[in-house]
Amino acid sequence: MKMLSRKFMVLLLVLLCVLAQAKVVVFLYHRFDDARYPSTNTWTEELERHIKIVKELDFDIWTIKDLEDYVYGSKKANKDAVVFTVDDGYRSVYEHAYKVFQSHGVPFCVFLQIGAVGYSDYLTWEMIDEMIRNGVEFANHSFSHTDFPALLSKMSENQMLEYFKTDLMKAQRIFKERTGKTMVYYAYPYGHYIPKMAEILQQEGFLLAFSQNPGPYDVSYGAFEIPREPLLEDWATESHVRYILSREPLVTENLPFVLQNGILTVKSKIVVPKEVRYATLYVSEKGLIKSRLENNTVFGETALKKMYNRLMISARDGKKEYLRYYLVFNAQGE
């Protein structure tokens, strides 16, 4: 029975990928034209170039509502799509990027750190109201921008999850009071999360949640671990944008790794692409790690010291590159 169930899940994953017919790449920005913070800055000239590249390559440009409809099956995608998102709600999005998006007719979503609204470097409620009237989407990026999983080093999991929920609902309440609208999308602060945070989001009526794991999105990934491509500094170049738009979503049979006592063990049965000719494993703490490929399954193992890592599984079928990133959280890490 277990063998039949496993085969059914593999078949379902493949079928989902075939039916989806398209990938979605979610762009992530923070600040615009702000030389004070180069690590989170994108120049508006670069933003304009990104928009032109997306249109030149004939990608659809979606709202997050379009993405929601696609994830839940009420929207079909006949070609690849891009979604533009901006995190934190810095004032530079209003002062610099807003007019660029408007001039090109490009929708975008701002994930707001609600507790920062009105401070000198951040949007005001008046700016937010104007942007809403002009079709800009807004979503929840927490009240306090806390690194929630990191709290597990000093409190229990239940305490951390209660803290997360309290913060989440405080942001919801304030936004509803100030705008009359309810946010149904969430971006994890710093892109850090554990699965139980996603469960709380679902319980509270959220429909999508976004990480900071790079890579294209496939519907088989689900609604609460949607990857996004940060486009800043060296990653904002034309060559990088063209590269990330060329990559395809990699699909695995199940969660492809376990972490136990600081040892990351990878055993990833790759479903898409169907025939893997070459595969690599990359861990942010270590770089490329030693791996072997056998019957479309890639194996690898390494010791980790840091609290957060990202695991990348990359594969080629001779024509294209397929990849997926995973957040690896080590509660005992540094």
Which residues fall in each region the model found?
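Beta-strand-enriched, solvent-exposed domains that form extended recognition/catalytic surfaces
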Residues: 249-334
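Metal-dependent polysaccharide deacetylase catalytic core of the NodB/CE4 family, i.e.
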Residues: 27-39, 57-60, 70, 78-82, ...
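Catalytic cores of secreted or luminal carbohydrate-active enzymes
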Residues: 219-253
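Bacterial N-terminal signal peptides that target proteins for export
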Residues: 1-9
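N-terminal pre-catalytic segment of deacetylase/amide-hydrolase enzymes
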Residues: 22-82, 245-255, 299, 313-334
